[in-house]
């Protein structure tokens, strides 16, 4: 459960990320593919080379997270269609959400060290876990 302090930390951090969200999403996705090669099985048609258009799929990740931040009090409603897509069409193994969350935290910490305090780190970790829970909620 996200506390009011968590929500404030998340909104403030995401505001600082701002226009870099798409780049950070792409970098986190690339990190995930390089660090956890089994995650590439869901993207056999992607060009995995650095800077490829396919790695830019990270923009979709960033857009979904921006949407979740904007609807932080109703993430299940805001992410319902995305949850359906991942559960029923793409059938992504839920563990991959944890892997991507970790890569997002590493990426954000490397680009925003001043803003990435222990409290912000904890809040973002809880937020990514909440998003992952929403995305896997329709797997049953």
Swiss-Prot record:
Residues 1-140 form the Globin domain. Keywords: Heme, Iron, Metal-binding, Oxygen transport, Transport. The keyword Transit peptide does not apply. GO terms for cellular component: blood microparticle; haptoglobin-hemoglobin complex; hemoglobin complex. PROSITE patterns: GLOBIN. One of its GO terms (molecular function) is peroxidase activity. Heme b binds at residue 86. Gene3D superfamilies: Globins. It holds the Pfam family Globin. GO terms for biological process: hydrogen peroxide catabolic process. O2 binds at residue 57. InterPro entries: Globin, Globin-like_sf, Globin/Proto, Hemoglobin_a-typ, Hemoglobin_oxygen_transport, Hemoglobin_pi. SUPFAM superfamilies: Globin-like (SSF46458). The keyword Iron applies. Red blood cells. Heterotetramer of two alpha chains and two beta chains. Involved in oxygen transport from the lung to the various peripheral tissues. Belongs to the globin family. This is Hemoglobin subunit alpha-1.
